[in-house]
Structure formats: structure tokens, C-alpha cells
Amino acid sequence: MDREIRILHTADTHLGYRQYHSEVRRQDFFKAFETVIQDAVDMQVDAVVHAGDLFDSRNPTLEDLLETMNILSRLKAVDIPFFGIVGNHESKQNTQWLDLFEEMGLAERLGKTPKLVGNTTIYGIDSVPKSKIPLYDYSGFELPDSLPENCKKLLVMHQIVQPFPYADWDCAEVLENLPFKVDAILLGDYHKYEKIKVGEEETWATYSGSTERNSASENEPRSYNIITLSGEGLEISRRTIPTRNFLFITAKIDGEEKPYEQIFSAINEHLEEIPESVVFLDISGNSDSVLSFSEIEEYLLSKGALVSKVKDARIKETLPEEVAKVAFSDPDHAVAEEIRRMSLNDGGLIVDEIIRSPDVVRSRVDEETENRLLRLIETIDFEDPDFRIEIPASPISSTDSIDPVSPINHPVSSADSVSAVSPESSADHVSPDIIENNEKPIPAVEAEKIETLDPAGETEFVAGIAGKTETFRAPVRIKNSESLNEALKKSYEAPDKVREAPDVNPEPPEPLPAFKNIGSPETFGSCETTVSSEVPEKGGERTELEDDAVNKTEKETGKLSGFGVEAGSEKEDADRIEKPAHVPDKAEKPVKQSQRKGKGKSAVPRQYNLGDYL
């Protein structure tokens, strides 16, 4: 060997790391790296080798890049080459940051092609994921065309290798598979300084350690290595780097009284060391007192600490063993159970499958979902109720269907009874419970006596027939000997066909002043009724004006023979047809429709239509 070669070996600088969210700590990492580079310039080393994790992130900020280039330019100014490999923290898919610096003439990326420094060749292997280590290809390593006499070979890696802790690659295996003998392996990724001999040839393997503390557990001094190669062999020496102080304080609480005084007393014992330090306070002892961590941290900051961290070890000490145990469930089983609990329909299951499928890329989720749902819709017959998901409604109470109520004290809600007047209340929509018992639903009514029309004892009532969305009031003639409920039941069970009224054209009744038009004549079963198209705007007792109007109406309609409907032309009937409006009563209480049956269409069990979701 013609002359002695000195190479500075460093690694794990983690530039750009804002430790504890502190801008000062970010600057500390750059200062440590700057110290290393300045030492290389001052010692006039032959080269600087960086063994990975130059940056803490694969996406450093522009400010981080500019500061790094300014520091590396110091080496370029004195013709000291900077060699590096890619670590796991900064690794990108294609072009690496080292490639950018190489284009700028600030660095050179190591690989299977050697870099020559004097009579020393340097190779590099970028960080390899653990899963790809068994597949690593050792072929392709080249030797210089003409090897210098007594040429030394160095290999740079960013990997934790055996026999070091947490190793995932056998260092001896690497040495055996290389096509040449290596004099030393310069390593990165392990933040602690280490130096041992490995393999049958007893090759040196060394970690330089990180240049700054990345965690509180890294309590040893930070350093870098100087590799000296000469005719006498290879020598590895360590140089430490001055870094910010990490101060650890322990406070033990004895008894329940004055815990803060005991803690502050322990802190005050280190007042000279606290300024500009990163301070960690561990609290132990009696756990009965409750402490405010923020108050303690503020006290440390008031004493000059750069960063203050408080750890309460008492919590861990008081936890019972069974509480401290952690159990993990199968994630696939948990997801399947949650999907089952959600009761998704076919469309929901399709969307869930697409979103969680690893075979569908994110950019194609919307397109794939739309296509699958369209195919599902094409296979569905929306007129066939079989594709619906039926949820049985709650059983109907007998009191909901046959108990008459007073129009004053017990107003009828449109959600409480069946609209026998509406076409929606046909036999096709009767509750299955009623069909099974061979009974027809009997509507709840509100009724009040109007007058006796003839000596035969027929009395006319105004019956409020409560439907799904509207309320009608209709005069119904019954005999005195029959109760209103029996009359309504008889009328409802009669044939559906309505007998035609004789050709009598009664004069239309005079309009009533405080009345509101809400509907047209309708039929209630076979009981031919005249449904008054006018009802009072407000509930309550009938006024004399209303009684006179009703009496006059009945006298006019009494000319009809038997039970008949109000006669008129088709045009007049069509003109009177309009959607009835529900006249709510002040005392009416809302009732959930899902709690009752026998209400027209709502008598069918509640259904969820897939079309509603699509």
C-alpha cells in the first residue's frame, strides 16, 4: 500500500426529524451532521461514507434539502468525496435523493460497481426489506479492471445483521455469497456503536451509531468512526459528537400529603442541569394522589428545560395483572361480525366487497361499484316483492281497531286506524294477522249524534273515518237499538258494491261559512254514505250554525230512497275530487306507524326496498 487511507464512517443522521415537535431539535440533527462533515474537512480524510438514513423521511422538506446541500458543498470545496447508500427511512420507489445529489456533484451512490479511493474499493447494498432478504441476488458485483497492490475492499450496508440484537440478516451469509473477500463491513441502522469480528475470516463489522439521539433510550454518547487502512492492516477508531443533554429525574412520592412539594423538591436538585436540556421526569411511589402532568411540565419549562416529559410509573404499578393483559381478536372475524350486524342488503354487500378487495385499485372503486350495481339492478324485478327484505310489524291490539272514541276527548289520529274509504284499503293490503283470524279490520271512529230523522228510530251520526293520510267525516244512519260499533261492523262486512241512488238530483247544499273542503264522496263498505266534503276547521263542540247547516243538508239528502249516495253529474263529481287533507287535533299525539297494523298499505309488514338504496 502506497499510503495510509482514512475514511470517515457515519450513519443514521435522520436529517429533518422534528423530535418532540420541536424546531430546535430539528436544528440539533443538522448541527450534529454539520459537526461530522466539518471534522472530515479539518482532518482531511480521503472520503466520507454514509451508511444510510441520511434523511428521516422519504419526503424531506425543501428547507431540509437546501441545508443538506449547503453542508455537503463543504466537502466538494476541498475535493473530499461523499459516498452513501439508501436507508429504510428515506427509500423511494424510483429515483433516490442520493441520485439527485450525484447529479449535482455533491455525492456518489454506492452499489455493485466499486468506488475507488486510493488502493481501496468500496461497495454498497441499499436497505433490503426483511421479506426480500432470502431473494437477494449477489450476482453483478464487479471488480476493477486492474486491482492495485494490496487492495482493500469495504462493503457498506444499512441492515441489522447477526449477531447484533434484532438482526434479520446473517452477516456470515453475506460474506460467503460475495464473489470476493471483504476486509470490513461498515454498517448502519443500529444507533449504537458496535465493533466485532464475524465469519471464518474474522472480518470486521462495525456500527458507527447515530449522530443524534432519536429516543430517550439512546443515552450513550453519539459518535462516528474513522477507518484507517495501511500496509499494517485495518484499524477502526471512534470519535464522539457533542449533542444536547438528555436529563433524567426520578421523583418518589411518600404518603398522600403534599405530592407536588415532593416532586418539585426532586426537580430543584437538578436546577443547574435543566437549562437547555430535554428533561424526563419519572414519578413513582404512592398512587393515591392525582397529579396534573401539564402543571409539572410547565414548572420544568419555567426552569429552562427545552422539552419536558413526565412519566407516571405509579399507574403501571397499581394495575392488577388481569387488567394489564391484552387480548386480540381475529380481525377477519371481527369485520365479518360487524357486517352481519349491519344487515346489509345485496347492494350494500357488493359495495363492501369492492371497497375491501385488494384486487380493486382505489382509482377503479367508483367504476367497479357502478358496474356491479347496474348488473344487480338488471336482474331485479321491482314489481316482484320477493326481493324485498321484510321486517315483521308489531302485533295489533284489539283496542286499536274497534274502540270508538269521542271526537272531543279522544281525537282519532290518521296513523291510528284503517282508512276504509280509501282505495288503498282493499283486501290485498289487509294485515296477515287479520286474515288468519278470518276477521276484517274494523275502523276506529269518532262520532256524535246529529238528529232523529224519522219515527222508525233511525238516527244519523257523523262518523270520523281515520285513514292513513286523511280524516273524513261521514253521516251514517243506524237504528237506535244498535250501537254505533255494531252498525259500523255490519256496514263494513256488507258487500262492496254500492247500490245506485234513484234519479234524484237534490239541490246542492248552501256553503257553510267556517267549513273547509277536504274531500269528495266516498263509500264505506256497502253502507252507502254521504261523505261530507266539508268539516269544521277546528275540533270541539258543534255550534248552532253548524247544526243548522247539517240539518239542512240532511233534509235535502233525505229525499233519496233508502241508503244512497249523493247524486250528481260525472263532471260535478270530478270537480269535487281533490286530495283530502288531514285536520289535526290539538290533543292528537303522534303514534309511530310501525307500532300498529291494519292501516291500509301499512298493514303489510314494513319493507326495505333495494331500489331506495340504489
Swiss-Prot record:
Homodimer. Forms a heterotetramer composed of two Mre11 subunits and two Rad50 subunits. Residues 487-502, 535-558, 568-591 have a biased composition (Basic and acidic residues). The gene is mre11. It comes from the Archaea. This is DNA double-strand break repair protein Mre11. GO terms for biological process: DNA repair; double-strand break repair. Pfam families: Metallophos. Mn(2+) 1 binds at D12, H14, D53, H191. It comes from Methanosarcina acetivorans (strain ATCC 35395 / DSM 2834 / JCM 12185 / C2A). Keywords: DNA damage, DNA repair, Endonuclease, Exonuclease, Hydrolase, Manganese, Metal-binding, Nuclease. One of its GO terms (molecular function) is DNA binding. Binds 2 manganese ions per subunit. Its cofactor is Mn(2+). Its EC number is 3.1.-.-. Nuclease activity is regulated by Rad50.
